[in-house]
């Protein structure tokens, strides 16, 4: 499908939607903007809707969005941007190219690029973008990305200093609920950029994400929550006047039983048929680190992706000194001050930070960099294999050179002893926790089940 003429809001069905578009399908090989008359970084485009302030429901998009990347500001599989509602929408296809151009502030997402909030003059929300029960099946999202982020910047400055790349939403300021990425078959989807905020669900989050993440993870998240829920019982005692007093107290026996069962199931020591069934289900959901347990071949990480449902990656440029800059997380790369995430889990994924900036890049199975001031981020589960890797220097004619490519094996064995490397951090749930607003942050019912590897 080719589009012609001047425009900055472009959709496979509707350029600007303030009404309702539902029960529609876009099935085109590609959405071609090469003949569109527009300046760079000005176009908001989606496979179905350009800008949405109304409702898009049951929109199923099967198309590639890979042309004229320099023109985009907001790009999404279903909608470019939305302050309305996107409900029960699906996307399958390719977005961007290996080094497809995106600029600071740009957004790219499997469902919508930018999920927005519109404010009244008094600061209250007039409209909130909602992504509900949407699904991204097979996706190849590959962009260059962009980042001018520095470790000393405050959260607001960071949000405006990077590209936002996510499997469902690029930049989320609204609400994401009940939405997933992945297929039942290990089809090897990929979300990758060389710079910016990258996440399996959202590149960045300053809104809310709940009950979202990997396919078929929700029942296992509910089981984790049940194990970690504090049980209570009524206890009757007699006071100093001989009166019976009933109070609610923690049932420590039940609590210990639940925790012991969780440990048995998650460590492969299940007892009884019910526990063994759970053990199989949890084990089957774990992501696979192809560089630890697979072929251990760096030049096949990006081409042979059949081990996992999804590869989420920040991918540095060729050579030891060409670092990727940004934050990488299974659910979100950057959780902003107002961001809140609940009851969500990465899936059978590989979260891979390849040659990421040593000084301030952050990598986490759920959240890369967390600066949230939310009262609680709870019910977070990581199933993904998480790896952060800094390349060694390649050799050529006996001299050290920055010559190894980002998918080459040369020099990779030297990473652990190279004197130029500095300490860096990777986490199963959170890569880095930044207390910019004091000590007001709480994690509840969070569990890492995936493997975690750091090259330092």
Give the location of each predicted region.
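Surface-exposed loop/turn motifs in large extracellular/passenger domains
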Residues: 1-456
């Amino acid at each position: 499908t080719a589009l012609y003429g001047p425009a900055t809001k472009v959709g496979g069905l509707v350029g600007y939607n303030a009404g309702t578009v539902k029960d529609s399908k876009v099935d085109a090989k590609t959405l071609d903007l090469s003949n569109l008359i527009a300046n760079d970084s000005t176009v908001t485009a989606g496979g179905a809707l350009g800008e949405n302030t109304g409702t898009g429901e049951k929109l199923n998009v099967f198309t590639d969005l890979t042309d004229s990347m320099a023109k985009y500001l907001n790009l999404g599989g279903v909608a470019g941007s939305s302050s309305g509602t996107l409900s029960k929408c699906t996307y399958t296809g390719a977005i961007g190219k290996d080094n497809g151009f995106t600029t600071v502030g740009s957004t790219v997402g499997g469902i919508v690029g930018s999920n927005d909030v519109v404010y009244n003059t008094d600061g209250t929300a007039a409209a909130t973008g909602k992504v509900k029960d949407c699904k991204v099946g097979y996706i190849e999202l590959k962009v260059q990305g962009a980042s001018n982020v520095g470790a000393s910047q405050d959260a607001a400055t960071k949000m405006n200093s990077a590209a936002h790349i996510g499997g469902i939403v690029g930049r989320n300021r609204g609400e994401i609920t009940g939405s997933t990425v992945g297929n039942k078959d290990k089809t090897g989807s990929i979300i990758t950029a060389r710079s910016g905020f990258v996440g399996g669900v959202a590149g960045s989050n300053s809104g809310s994400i709940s009950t979202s993440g990997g396919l078929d993870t929700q029942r296992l998240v509910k089981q984790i929550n049940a194990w970690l829920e504090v049980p209570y019982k009524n206890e009757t005692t007699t006071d100093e006047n001989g009166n019976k007093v009933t109070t609610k107290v923690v049932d420590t026996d039940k609590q210990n039983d639940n925790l012991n069962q969780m440990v048995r199931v998650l460590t492969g020591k299940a007892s009884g048929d019910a526990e063994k069934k759970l053990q199989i289900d949890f084990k089957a959901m774990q992501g696979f680190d192809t560089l630890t347990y697979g072929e251990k071949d760096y030049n096949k990480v990006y081409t042979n992706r059949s081990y996992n449902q999804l590869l989420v990656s920040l991918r540095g440029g060729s050579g030891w000194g060409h670092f990727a800059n940004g934050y990488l997380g299974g659910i979100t790369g950057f959780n902003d001050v107002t961001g809140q995430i609940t009851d969500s889990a990465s899936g059978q994924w590989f979260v891979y930070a390849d040659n990421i900036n040593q000084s301030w890049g952050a990598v986490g199975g759920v959240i890369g960099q967390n600066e949230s001031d939310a009262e609680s981020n709870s019910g977070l589960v990581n199933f993904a294999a998480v790896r952060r890797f800094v390349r060694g220097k390649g050799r050529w004619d006996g001299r050290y050179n920055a010559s190894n490519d980002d998918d080459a094996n040369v020099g990779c064995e030297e990473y652990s002893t190279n004197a130029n490397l500095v300490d860096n951090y990777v986490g199963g749930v959170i890569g880095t926790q930044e207390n910019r607003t004091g000590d007001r942050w709480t994690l509840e019912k969070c569990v890492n089940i995936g493997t975690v590897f750091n090259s330092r």
